[in-house]
Amino acid sequence: MKMFNFLTKTTLCLVVSTALLTMSADAQKTQKLTDPEIASVAVTANQIDIDYAAIAQKKSKNAEVLKFAATMAKDHQAVIDQAVALVTKLKVTPKTNATTKSFLAGATKTKAMLNAKSGKAFDKAYVDNEVAYHKAAINEVETVLIPQSSNSELKSLLQSAVPLFKAHLAHAQMVQKNLK
């Protein structure tokens, strides 16, 4: 019974994370994002992962999970810093939109779920979420944000982030495998 509850909760975590980004991708197929909206999506998605990492840094006792969370916080902050520098240079203000609102709503649920867990169950839920989140984020960047961006510098920033996100996914999958 404990294994069933554990698997059910882990599955819920993955569903919430994947649904968050899938819903936004589906919504954006019918509505083109502007560059200020794309900047908002990029900053929001990166900040959400920093928030997840902060939870992991407070709750986890696993050295590998803690190291991964520190990497997520550092790398995603660097992407935000690059995005902020670019929008400042371009004199563009990121614009909140349906996608950013959807991300934030999903993140609220995921953070509550993560905060409700502890020990090995937390570590597994956090890392499983990171795998799902990075898969969905890579898809969102490649299929929505890059194709819809008009500004070449914004497009270039997004393209340069994809290899980093793919490295994060590989790292998360490695940690996930080691937790089993």
Indicate where each model-derived feature is located:
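His/Met- and acidic-residue-enriched segments that coordinate or traffic transition-metal cofactors
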Residues: K2-L14, A19-K180
